[in-house]
Swiss-Prot record:
This is Zinc-type alcohol dehydrogenase-like protein C1198.01. GO terms for cellular component: Golgi apparatus. It comes from the Eukaryota. It is found in: Golgi apparatus. Belongs to the zinc-containing alcohol dehydrogenase family. Class-III subfamily. Binds 2 Zn(2+) ions per subunit. Residues 14-36 are annotated as: Disordered. PANTHER family: DEHYDROGENASE, PUTATIVE (AFU_ORTHOLOGUE AFUA_5G03930)-RELATED (PTHR42813:SF1), ZINC-TYPE ALCOHOL DEHYDROGENASE-LIKE (PTHR42813). GO terms for molecular function: oxidoreductase activity; zinc ion binding.
Amino acid sequence: MEYLTNLKTNIMDKQLGHREVSEGSTQPKPDPSGATMKACVWDGPLNVKIAEVPKPTITHPKDVIVKTTACTICSGSDSHIFSGEMPGIEKGAILGHESCGIVAEKGDEVNNLEIGDRVVIAFDLACGQCSFCKRHEYAACDTTNDSKLMDVNYGSHHSAIFGYTKLLGDVPGCQAEYIRVPFAEINCCKLPDDIPDSEGLFMSDVLCTSLHACTLGEVKKGDTVAIWGMGPIGLYAGRWAQILGASKVIGIEVVPERIELARQKFGFTVIDRNEVSDVPKKIMELVSNGVDCAIEASGFRFSTSILHKVERAVGLETDSPDMITECLNAVRKYGHVSIIADYVGTSNQFPIGHVVMKHLTIRSGQCPCQNYFGYVIDNIRSGKIDPRWMVTNKIKFDDLPDAYNKLFYKEDGYVKVYCDMTE
């Protein structure tokens, strides 16, 4: 079913053509010398490989080329792409959207960065000049994503995202030796000398996105917060909630190693799905009337009901609503639901009545990382946030294909990898 959806998406993308983008092209020019580089590329469902691809060079005067020093795998969207469940990808696409590195080349119109600067790269690509960017709504940038198909599917388009299918601009990803970064002045954050790569890398997505989850949920001092999914985003959403003053953080998880991590390192109350069948009921036992904020950080692939497992299997829906339904049942009246996980299509039996009858506020969407860089740096420096807590495995670049499998199948305790590209 995923194969047919992906094929249809790619055909429609070609038929519709592409919008003009302000960076000139979402595809970088190859180095005129013919130089190549290593990159991790998609090779069909449940397959990635390391391949030699053309090295990028400056394509637009606002570009920089970053020599990658570290990258990682997103256990959410990268896993969805790896499995073939995220439509709009073709063999050979460079994966990844989380990286940091050193500026190796820069365009003539880049004024706030110099060759040799250490930078972390926002996963969402903004131009800095459109009406959305001027409102600091960078993840909605109107000029970096060339997909007409996204306009057809959703009525408008998202910003481009590195390594994230044709619907998000088909921009080559960050799991590569070199990365072309358009509009570098807004999309690169210079890393201070006291923030090493092992910490700064995770500003590219996890630390900013998890903070954004709390912003969407309007978490404040004294709140009770429940989080579905104890992957990196869920874990750090809980940590940010603690920093913001939450009185209780409840995590919901099924993988034993993640349950242990949430309890021991983060100090959450954890509901183990292996032991509890009715999660909302258990939450109501822990918090009278329900939590102030429910954060969904697990994603569209996860179903608890036979109905939605069958509907997804036969193509009657693309996204299971089971986790969101649990959120709606577990949150208090007038509470907040924050959907930070990936949802891309349609769901059946969505309980819209809960939203109205319980007076709920639901907010969602990708993170505008650029808004959070300064605050995250301050909290890393103070020691309130330690990105190293999530890293379960340190790997080399050639180990990425194996790490994709381990993360997707949740094997050997994999939660988050740190891929050192300096060795």
